[in-house]
C-alpha cells in the first residue's frame, strides 16, 4: 500500500475528522484562558497586549482576529486584580484542555492506551501549555531586542549593511521556527510513547509548513471571497475561528499520523509506554 493511501486509511480509521472537530472545540474554549495567562506574564516584560495579539494576527483570518481582540481587551479591562493569582491558575488549567485533547488524539494515532494517571496527563498538558507560552514570548522578544543585538554585533565584527539585512530576515523568520519547536515538543511529549526528536521531525515539519500555508490561504479566502459576517451575523467571527481551528486540528492529527506511520514502517523496536 502506498504511503499516502495508508496515511488516508489511518486518518479515516482513527476518525480524524471527528478528532479534528473535537480539537477545534477545545481550542476555542482554551484560546482566551491561554491568552489571559500569556498576557499576564507580559506585564513583567517589555511587551504589550498588541505585541502578543500581533503574533496571532499573522495567521488568523481578519474577521476572527477582530473577535479575539475585542474579547481579550474586554476580559483584561474587567479583570479583578485581587483574584489575579487564582485567575492565572484557572486560566492555565482551562488552557491545558486543548493540550489534553491533543494528547488523546496522538495516543490514538500510535494505537496506544493511556495508562498514565490523570494527574500525570494533566501535568503534561499544563507543561506543554507553559512551554508554548514561553516559546511564543521568546519569539516576541526577539523582534523587540533583535535590532539592537544586530547593531551591536555589526559594530563588534565590523559587518556591512548586508549583515543587518540578513539579521533582519532572521529575526522576522522566527515565527516558522517557533511553530516547528512547538509541534516537535507536542509530538515528542504528548503521546504515551517514548519517542526521540528525530522520529517526530517529519510530522513537525509537515504541520509547520502546512499550517502556515493553510492559514494564509484560508485568511485570503475569507477576506476576499467569503463574507461570514453577512451570512451568520454577529457570530461570523466565531464561525471563522472554529473553521480555522478545525483545519489546524486536521494538520496536527495528520502530522501525528505521519510520524506514527513512519515509525511503523521502519519497524523500530517498540518502546514501552510510560508507567
Swiss-Prot record:
Cellular localization per UniProt: Cell membrane
Pfam family, one: Virul_fac_BrkB
Membrane topology listed for this record: Multi-pass membrane protein
UniProt keyword list: Cell membrane, Exonuclease, Hydrolase, Membrane, Nuclease, Transmembrane, Transmembrane helix
Coiled coil: none
An example Gene Ontology CC term for this record: plasma membrane
GO molecular function, one term: exonuclease activity
UniProt keyword annotation of Zinc present: no
Transmembrane segments: 23-43, 83-103, 126-146, 172-192, 199-219, 235-255
Cysteine-cysteine disulfides: none
UniProt name for this protein: Putative ribonuclease-like protein YfkH
Organism: Bacillus subtilis (strain 168)
Source organism phylogeny: Bacteria, Bacillati, Bacillota, Bacilli, Bacillales
